[in-house]
A protein has these predicted regions:
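PLD/PLD-like phosphodiesterase catalytic module centered on the HKD motif
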Residues: 1-44, 48-170
Length: 170
């Protein structure tokens, strides 16, 4: 899939149920491209470790690069960022460059399966409810956006800073 295939605006983003790793990956690619095209000011992504997200793909980091303008903010919530470092080096490089707009938080409470796998934006959301089958829902509905944002805000309140952009040594 290339940038031409991706949605030009958030109204073209899928709504309803999704299922399977391919559909899940495409959903993330489309969402980041829509964020770049529409200038979404805030994005929150949450997952236990982001291992199966396509964060390191050229299309995603390119869309994030296009999205990275004044006044933007990406918040990441995860239990562990080891998989991001190991599987998504292109994203790690992007994150280091844009560390001033990327906040990474660690969630240490409860088992990892209780941490939602989701993306929240002011315009659109998705949540993966079945991690094994990569199945969940996406949409623009205000009630879903509000409910997901409230749940993620609760996680943020209990989180700690994590995944520093640089590691300073002695």
């Amino acid at each position: 899939m290339n940038a031409v295939d991706l949605a030009a605006d958030d109204s073209a983003l899928p709504e309803g149920r999704f299922s399977g790793r391919t559909e899940f990956g495409n959903l993330i690619r489309q969402a980041f491209q829509a964020a770049a095209n529409q200038g979404w000011r805030e994005i929150i992504i949450c997952d236990a470790d982001f291992e199966d997200w396509p964060l390191g793909e050229r299309a995603v980091t390119s869309a994030l690069g296009d999205w990275s303008r004044t006044g933007r903010k990406l918040t990441m919530i995860a239990r562990n960022y080891d998989a991001v470092t190991r599987r998504h080096p292109r994203f790690v490089t992007w994150r280091q460059t844009w560390s001033h707009i990327v906040e990474c938080r660690g969630s240490a409470s409860g088992p990892s399966d209780t941490l939602p796998s989701a993306m929240w934006t002011p315009n659109w959301v998705f949540e993966r409810l079945d991690l094994e089958r990569s199945a969940g829902y996406s949409g623009h509905e205000a009630a879903r956006r509000v409910a997901l944002k409230e749940g993620l805000n609760e996680r943020l309140l209990k989180s700690i800073p994590a995944f520093p952009a640089t590691t300073l040594g002695l």
